[in-house]
Structures are given as structure tokens and as C-alpha cells.
């Protein structure tokens, strides 16, 4: 929508996007994520992208921006989606503010994508178990390995995303409000059918993608 005002604060601005107002963090002039985010809020934004939430001040402003009706997108350095929520709590964000402002958490990893020249990799069950596979995962398990050809050189071509997509369900919200930890949030996510990063990666491997 041409009328939608999309503004970002990034460190650094890696890609210039037409139609989007982008600001780069610059510590030399005290342009931090928090200060840039405050400046963005004075420009009547519809969508805000904060490159990274690194401290409590930035987290608080991002949460308040969400609570006042803005769509806020950001990143945190954590191991998976449940730990992202725990990270916000550990930073000092009140649980009720998290449940009121956060709607979706996505954890991402990138793996090398196997090229079409791949070939089946047949390993004995003992080797797979030694690599961390569970016995219940070995049935009809087919993995692949890189070969290499004129189209890829080393058997790989690009990257494939491995994701954990965790909506903030009512069950997860209750755990957050009760002061629960990342392990409890992860258990609730599994019970609601949300695959973790390991399960997502295993599916991509079975599909011959990585």
C-alpha cells in the first residue's frame, strides 16, 4: 500500500528499499537503536522495523510502540523461539506487556542447500544414533550427500531456511504470565504441534534439501 508508512532503524542498512524510510545506527552522533526508535515514532509510522533489540530501553520502546497500534518487527540473538520470550523477560519487560504486544516469534537458521546432483547417503543405524538421531526417527529415513557438478562445483547451491514459527497461543501466554521459563514455553509449543528447529531441520534433510 502506497499510503503505508514503513520506517526502519538498522545497524547497518544493508539493502536500500524503495518506498521505505531507513535510518542507520551511528554511535558517533549518539544515534542508538533507542534514540532512532523514538525519532521514528514522531513520524507517524504504520510499520516499524528495529534491526536488533540489544537493551532494555530499546525493548521497552518497541513494546510500547506495539501496544499503541504499530506493527513492530525486530530481532534478538537467542537459540530458539521460546528463548526469545524468556530473553525479553530477563531483560526486564513485564510478562503482561509481552503477552499484550508479541503476536508471533520466528527462529531461523540457514543451512547449505544440496544441489540436484546429490546422491543418497546410506548409513547404518548405529552411525545415525551416534550422530544424535533417535530410534523413532530412523524408520524410512533417507538422507543425501553432496556430489558436485558443473552447475554447483561442490554439491551445494544457495541456502535453505530452517524455521520455528511460534504464535503466542493462550497456553503460552498463561505460562509467561505465571513467570514460566523457556523450557515450559517450549513444552507448551510442542504440545500445540509447533515443530522445534531440530524437527524442522530433520524434515528438510528428509526432503533432500540439506
Predicted regions and their residues:
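Short, flexible helix-loop junctions that flank or precede catalytic/ligand sites
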Residues: 1-210
Amino acid at each position: 500500500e502506497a499510503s503505508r508508512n514503513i520506517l526502519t532503524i538498522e545497524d547497518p542498512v544493508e539493502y536500500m528499499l524503495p518506498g521505505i524510510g531507513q535510518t542507520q545506527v551511528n554511535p558517533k552522533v549518539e544515534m542508538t537503536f533507542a534514540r532512532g526508535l523514538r525519532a521514528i515514532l514522531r513520524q507517524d509510522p504504520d510499520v516499524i522495523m528495529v534491526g536488533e533489540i540489544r537493551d532494555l530501553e530499546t525493548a521497552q520502546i518497541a513494546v510500547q510502540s506495539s501496544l499503541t497500534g504499530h506493527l513492530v518487527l525486530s530481532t534478538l540473538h537467542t537459540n530458539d523461539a521460546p528463548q526469545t520470550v524468556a530473553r525479553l523477560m530477563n531483560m526486564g519487560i513485564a510478562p503482561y506487556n509481552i503477552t499484550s504486544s508479541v503476536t508471533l516469534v520466528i527462529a531461523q537458521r540457514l543451512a547449505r542447500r544440496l544441489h540436484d546432483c546429490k546422491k543418497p547417503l546410506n548409513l547404518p543405524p548405529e552411525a545415525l544414533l551416534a550422530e544424535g538421531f533417535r530410534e523413532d526417527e530412523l524408520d524410512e529415513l533417507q538422507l543425501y550427500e553432496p556430489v558436485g557438478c558443473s552447475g554447483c562445483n561442490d554439491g551445494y547451491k544457495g541456502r535453505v531456511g530452517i524455521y520455528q514459527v511460534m504464535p503466542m497461543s493462550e497456553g503460552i501466554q498463561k505460562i509467561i504470565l505465571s513467570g514460566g521459563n523457556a523450557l515450559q514455553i517450549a513444552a507448551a509449543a510442542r504440545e500445540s504441534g509447533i515443530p522445534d528447529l531440530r524437527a524442522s531441520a530433520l524434515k528438510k534433510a528428509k526432503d533432500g534439501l540439506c
